[in-house]
Amino acid sequence: MATLEQRLTELLDAPIVALGYELWGIEFIRAGKHSTLRVYIDHANGISVDDCAEASHQVSALLDVEDPITTEYYLEVSSPGMDRPLLKPEHFARYIGQVATVTLRMAVNNRRKYKGTIKQVDGEMITLTIDGRDEILAFANIQQANLIPNFD
């Protein structure tokens, strides 16, 4: 059975692409009565506030018709930003050589938090280099991952 995020991705991908953007990812954060649906869009030339407004209008109209979320929620449409979330193995592959932070669902070697250079992506396995040592992490065990901006 598909997760809510997967169903929303299937629903929203084509309309976002039709607007000329990439659907970077979706996060649904449950928080009491008012949850938040975050829709990240991207474009090679960056994303403006007007781009977010255009996509938000389209997404909101589509969600009103399809009604895939039965509870109350806030809709946020934004760029993934410089510290963008890495939500798919393809995101890690796009940023090989860059530094990322990773938080695991279940500890590996008594450790849940990692910060290292993305070295390799092999299917569902992500390799980070941390202090000269490679750590291989299963994508399915990643709770959260973000790119660390490089200002050099």
Swiss-Prot record:
CDD domains: YlxS_C
First-listed, main subcellular location of the protein, grouped into a coarse class: cytoplasm
Cellular component annotations (GO), alphabetically ordered: cytosol
Keywords: Cytoplasm, Ribosome biogenesis
GO biological process, any: translation
Cellular localization per UniProt: Cytoplasm
Pfam families with a match to the protein in the record: DUF150_C (PF17384), RimP_N (PF02576)
Family: Belongs to the RimP family.
Role description: Required for maturation of 30S ribosomal subunits.
PANTHER family according to UniProt: RIBOSOME MATURATION FACTOR RIMP
Protein's name according to its UniProt entry: Ribosome maturation factor RimP
